[in-house]
């Protein structure tokens, strides 16, 4: 018997259907459930029956909510709900949102958009819209619309404003219903070009030199949403030729690239990063890309591949280039292996760009400790205008590029800590992330407040 047929059966005996899956059904009752109801449910479903005892007030509130949803469905049918969802997605697209948060509360449905790394709220919607909007999104992603107690993940694609778009969806049970976060998957409007990333000339030269080597490990590090994927794909595109066999293992496959052999992991089927990586190494690759190093086994396979004639590119979640080296050691990788295989580490962050239409110099300057930045930094203000609304428009990447030189290899083998490694690298000319941010402030591209928001202020001497 289908879920929609169980609902009236339960109501006939003053019970309420809460949940139904392949093994169990859950019902709420005010008193002891009637024997007739239990017998009918067992006969109709052949499933285990879980019973919750609710107060009459709880039963009445849930019933009223269901009646409101039913009335809403009559007045705002599937076509209108679908159109309403499309309007939300189109508005997110117009505002260049990377994520959409759909959050039911007791009194309204809240929708927030993450634009340039910061959440902005849209006008509140009626709470009765929560259930049909969430159901519509779950249908698009082929999720179980009857499952409200467990998180679910999925993907879907649709055409909006004449463009094919892909979304990743994640649900989470909360106090007043299911919260949904939609991630707009990478739409590559810009060319995947190393020149367009925003690296300085010396950083770009070091990147190209490592990328053109026949073997070695290149790591791009930073938190989620820091632009690592675009940097990684731009590097791969720079080497994407008929004479080069490029294989990747990803989760998910975010940017399809012609000429590359891309594999998406599937843990449920046993297709993990390390199992795919082992298989890729039997595919005669010249270049291997691992979407993310998540565990010691994947790290060890990647490092061994980089030692045996393969160029390997991957990402790692660390705060700086020097911390990357100690993080690999904490994962159990031997120092000699890191020293011999690693060729370059890039740390990066994204900061919001000041709107060029309303940006102005405040006329004052900020003095930082000399060890952080030797010159006064201009203070910029941007109040917001019809072009940006918030004072910022778009984002730019800040980079810290660490080539693994012979001196640094020796320091790794000796077991230098992150602070000692950074001192060694800065003495050799490396620009830190904070220094990269200060340079962008001097150029009027971003503000000190934005750099501090993203990076904090390092400890000065």
Where are these regions (language model features)?
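Short glycine/Trp-rich loop-beta-loop segment that forms part of the substrate-binding cleft
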Residues: 26-63, 198-208
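Core recognition of P-loop NTPase motor domains used across DNA-transaction enzymes
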Residues: 8-11, 15-18, 36, 40, ...
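Short, basic, glycine/proline-bearing loop/turn elements
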Residues: 23-25, 69-75, 261-263
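A short, compositionally biased micro-patch
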Residues: 20-21, 44, 105, 213
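Polyanionic, low-complexity intrinsically disordered segments
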Residues: 1-43, 152-161, 166-172, 460
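Short, flexible helix-loop junctions that flank or precede catalytic/ligand sites
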Residues: 78-91, 95-461
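Charged, low-hydrophobicity low-complexity segments
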Residues: 43, 50-90, 95
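Short alpha-helical interface patches
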Residues: 12-13, 21, 45-46, 51-68, ...
């Amino acid at each position: 018997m289908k879920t929609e047929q169980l609902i009236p059966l339960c109501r006939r005996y003053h019970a309420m259907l809460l949940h139904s899956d392949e093994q169990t059904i859950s019902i709420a009752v005010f008193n002891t459930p009637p024997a007739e109801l239990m017998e009918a449910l067992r006969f109709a479903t052949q499933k285990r029956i879980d019973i919750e005892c609710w107060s009459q007030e709880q039963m009445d509130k849930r019933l009223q909510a269901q009646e409101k949803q039913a009335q809403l469905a009559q007045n705002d049918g599937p076509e209108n709900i679908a159109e309403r969802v499309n309007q939300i997605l189109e508005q997110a697209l117009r505002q260049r949102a990377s994520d959409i948060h759909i959050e039911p509360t007791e009194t309204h449905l809240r929708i927030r958009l993450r634009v340039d790394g910061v959440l902005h709220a849209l006008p509140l919607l009626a709470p009765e819209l929560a259930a049909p909007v969430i159901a519509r999104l779950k249908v698009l992603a082929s999720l179980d619309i009857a499952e409200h107690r467990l998180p679910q993940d999925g993907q879907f694609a649709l055409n909006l404003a004449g463009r094919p778009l892909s979304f990743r969806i994640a649900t989470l049970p909360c106090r007043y219903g299911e919260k949904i976060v939609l991630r707009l998957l990478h739409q590559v409007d810009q060319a995947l070009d190393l020149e367009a990333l925003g690296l300085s000339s010396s950083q770009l030269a070091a990147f190209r030199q490592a990328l053109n080597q026949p073997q070695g490990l290149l790591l791009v590090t930073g938190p989620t949403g820091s632009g690592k994927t675009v940097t990684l794909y731009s590097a791969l595109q720079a080497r994407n030729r008929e004479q080069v066999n490029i294989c990747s293992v990803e989760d998910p496959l975010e940017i399809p690239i012609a000429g590359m052999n891309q594999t998406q992991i599937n843990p449920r089927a046993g297709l993990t990063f390390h199992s795919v990586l082992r298989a890729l190494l039997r595919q005669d690759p010249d270049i291997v890309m691992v979407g993310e190093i998540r565990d010691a086994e994947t790290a060890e396979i990647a490092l061994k591949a980089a030692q045996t004639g393969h160029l390997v590119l991957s990402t790692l979640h660390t705060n700086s280039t020097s911390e990357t080296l100690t993080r690999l050691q904490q994962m159990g990788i031997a120092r000699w292996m890191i020293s011999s295989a690693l060729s370059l580490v890039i740390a990066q962050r994204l900061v919001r760009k000041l709107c060029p239409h309303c940006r102005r110099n405040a006329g004052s300057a900020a003095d930082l400790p000399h060890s952080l930045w030797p010159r006064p930094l201009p203070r910029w203000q941007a109040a917001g205008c019809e072009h940006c609304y918030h004072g910022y428009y778009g984002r730019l990447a800040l980079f810290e590029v660490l080539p693994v030189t012979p001196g640094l290899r020796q320091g790794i083998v000796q077991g230098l800590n992150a602070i000692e490694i950074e001192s060694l690298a800065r003495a050799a000319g490396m620009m830190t992330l904070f220094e990269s941010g200060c340079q962008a402030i001097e150029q009027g591209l971003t503000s000190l407040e934005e750099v501090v928001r993203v990076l904090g202020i390092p400890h000065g001497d």
